[in-house]
């Protein structure tokens, strides 16, 4: 039997907000239970696999590569990238600059890679930057 109007207690603010919260939860349940399930998109994993494969085909057109070898090379590229970026960041901080330029990248490559490998990397990097600069103009 419903209570008489005289028996009702004056409403306080706490129960009013408490009664609103379940309504919001119910609204959330209704949308979930309605069957409008969105198909989850698979998280894209960024790798260097396609680039590694292209370089492999330039150097050895008739040679393939296993998934395990590709994974190892991808880890290697990520590791070198992280080392160069960290070193370039330190160099920029030492020189009180907020921007990493090609000069910091070049210096960090010289510091990280040994001897002849550093020379080849710097020359290839310079060639790539020159090619990019000429194509954007």
UniProtKB/Swiss-Prot annotation:
SMART domains: H2B. Keywords: Acetylation, Chromosome, DNA-binding, Isopeptide bond, Nucleosome core, Nucleus, Phosphoprotein, Ubl conjugation. Residues 1-10 have a biased composition (Basic and acidic residues). It comes from the Eukaryota. SUPFAM superfamilies: Histone-fold (SSF47113). GO terms for molecular function: DNA binding; protein heterodimerization activity; structural constituent of chromatin. The keyword Acetylation applies. The modification N6-acetyllysine is found at residues 8-9, 13, 24. The modification Phosphoserine is found at residue 12. Residues 1-45 are annotated as: Disordered. There is a cross-link at residues 8-9, 24-25 (Glycyl lysine isopeptide (Lys-Gly) (interchain with G-Cter in SUMO)). Signal peptide: none annotated. One of its GO terms (cellular component) is nucleosome. Monoubiquitinated by the ubc-2-bre-1 complex to form H2BK123ub1. H2BK123ub1 gives a specific tag for epigenetic transcriptional activation and is also prerequisite for H3K4me and H3K79me formation. H2BK123ub1 also modulates the formation of double-strand breaks during meiosis and is a prerequisite for DNA-damage checkpoint activation. There is a cross-link at residue 131 (Glycyl lysine isopeptide (Lys-Gly) (interchain with G-Cter in ubiquitin)). It is found in: Nucleus; Chromosome. Core component of nucleosome. Nucleosomes wrap and compact DNA into chromatin, limiting DNA accessibility to the cellular machineries which require DNA as a template. Histones thereby play a central role in transcription regulation, DNA repair, DNA replication and chromosomal stability. DNA accessibility is regulated via a complex set of post-translational modifications of histones, also called histone code, and nucleosome remodeling. The nucleosome is a histone octamer containing two molecules each of H2A, H2B, H3 and H4 assembled in one H3-H4 heterotetramer and two H2A-H2B heterodimers. The octamer wraps approximately 147 bp of DNA. Belongs to the histone H2B family. This is Histone H2B. It comes from Neurospora crassa (strain ATCC 24698 / 74-OR23-1A / CBS 708.71 / DSM 1257 / FGSC 987). The lineage of its organism: Eukaryota, Fungi, Dikarya, Ascomycota, Pezizomycotina.
